[in-house]
Amino acid sequence: RATPRARPPRRMSVSARLLSPAALPRVTPAPRRGGRSDPPRARRRVSASTTGDDAAYDRARLEADASAMRAQRERMTDALERRNADVDDAARDDPHGEWKWAIRKRIWDRMEDTNVAQFPRPVHHRIPNFVNADKAAANLTALQCFKDAECVKVNPDTPQKAVRRAVLEAGKTLMTPQPRLRTGFFSVLSEELVPAIAADAAVLKKCCTSAGVASHGVPLSLNEMRARRCDLLVIGSCAVDVKSGARLGKGEGFAELEYAIMRMMGTIDDSTLVVTTVHDTQLLDGGEIDTRRLLRHDVPVDLIVTPTRTIWIDKAAQPAKPEGIYWDILSPQKLAQVKVLRDLRAEVEAELGETLPTGPDETLPPLAVRAEKKKMREASRGGGR
């Protein structure tokens, strides 16, 4: 194992002052063991799987996913119809990046048509799973940047399942968000926190799933998140440009939110490597994504790993990474949907003594409606059948 690295001092620009709660009182980090700050073990793991009914948890999660996908499908259809209208696309105002939908659809269609897509299918409106995703994961784990990392944040999507397993098998700490930040914040797992990971293959396999994270993972509070350092970020993508590292997700913006929150908390900084594992079919020719059309919160990657290639992005061609949460473009609907954003906003406003700006309204997939919250609560009690 690599020697734990000292946490570098954070450089705070004037503009980032409003984006980050760096001036808020810092909690005293918990005693470090093995270079990590561990949350209290006695803390209850609140999840839909605390009763052990993983099937109920998965049913509730999949129902919420299906609802979100239906809304995203309608959003894509509307965006493509507007693009096909007799309007000069180059001159048209596109504040929400609707041009991205044409690229997403092309990649999703190609993966299905060539049978590169893997379960769950169809891959439309998902971070698409692909043939040989495990080989892409193996190529990543062979790199020095992975070997040196002690804590690795990995998205909860299916194509990165092998990466999550590799993190745990290597004795590292896995940090992963709740899907869509819908039921919580970030959780961590490791052999130290869950000794059965090293002794029981079934537990290891389960901990690589969303239900396993919910039942075995230790949720982090905001203060515990501030006390941690993440060494490597692995995110899923729909498509990625091999020249600039510009990437497209499935269109909900949660990878960008997760990155912004981690930057704001000081868990990562601009130098933290961002990696995506994708199939070669998902690669876009250099320059196919016009970086001038990217939005402020879009997160580029530093490294692309496929089953056959490892592509390092030239910093000179890479767009800037977000510095934190841009409150002025964050809609009231997104704030209402994600509790951790409301908590962070309240902290910053209390520190500054002023109200932060809010972005324009938007229509979101129905992830936070009361009916689905009720289903998740029923699942946590073993019901919801």
Task: Describe each region flagged by the PLM.
Residues 152-180, 185, 194-195:
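Extended, H/D-rich, highly charged conserved domains that either
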Residues 33-36, 40-44, 370-378:
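Arg/Lys-rich low-complexity patches in intrinsically disordered regions that function as generic
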Residues 1, 178-182, 309:
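Short, acidic/turn-prone active-site loops that include or flank metal/cofactor-
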Residues 1-32:
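N-terminal chloroplast transit peptides
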Residues 12-16, 40-55:
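N-terminal mitochondrial targeting presequences
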Residues 146-155, 231-234:
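Short hydrophobic beta-strand segments
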Residues 128-147, 159-162:
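A short, well-structured juxtamembrane/interface segment
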Residues 50-123, 139-142, 170-173, 184-385:
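Surface-exposed, charge/polar-rich loops and edge strands
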